């Protein structure tokens, strides 16, 4: 019997380095450093993808889009998110909501959250109100506090399609 609700959790982290663009939630942000990664290294979208895949018991982003596969080199993470939603929907589920937190010292992300919500909602094909995003710092502690990287955490609720 198909469960009416499923919950998934996702996490991602990438190193901040000069010479890379900074993508967050599908929005390019102006900053002196960007995130290193095989794709565009959008930690927020990657955490959301893992939460969605986890909720549907479909493993993780690295399984579906392995960094060893050259077709994903530099890929726009919005494309990966759209493909993940196709997989989720193929299992008979729709998104209930997403709640995500980004941990970064710089840049300040709160001014960009409405744009990120809009982009994510458009890619996932849901209402903006279904996407909750928050930004925090680590009070200068750890790799995030030293501005060596940015991490993101996400929870997704899936609802069985009627």
UniProtKB/Swiss-Prot annotation:
List residues binding 4-CDP-2-C-methyl-D-erythritol 2-phosphate: 12-14, 38-39, 60-62, 136-139, 143, 146
Pathway-wise, it operates in: Isoprenoid biosynthesis; isopentenyl diphosphate biosynthesis via DXP pathway; isopentenyl diphosphate from 1-deoxy-D-xylulose 5-phosphate: step 4/6
Q: How is the cofactor bound?
A: Binds 1 divalent metal cation per subunit.
Q: What is its EC number?
A: 4.6.1.12
Give the source's domain of life in one word.
Answer: Bacteria
Oligomeric state and partners?
Homotrimer.
PANTHER family with a match to the protein in the record: 2-C-METHYL-D-ERYTHRITOL 2,4-CYCLODIPHOSPHATE SYNTHASE, CHLOROPLASTIC
Family according to the record: Belongs to the IspF family.
Q: What is this protein called?
A: 2-C-methyl-D-erythritol 2,4-cyclodiphosphate synthase
Tell me the organism: Porphyromonas gingivalis (strain ATCC BAA-308 / W83)
**Taxonomic placement:** Bacteria, Pseudomonadati, Bacteroidota, Bacteroidia, Bacteroidales
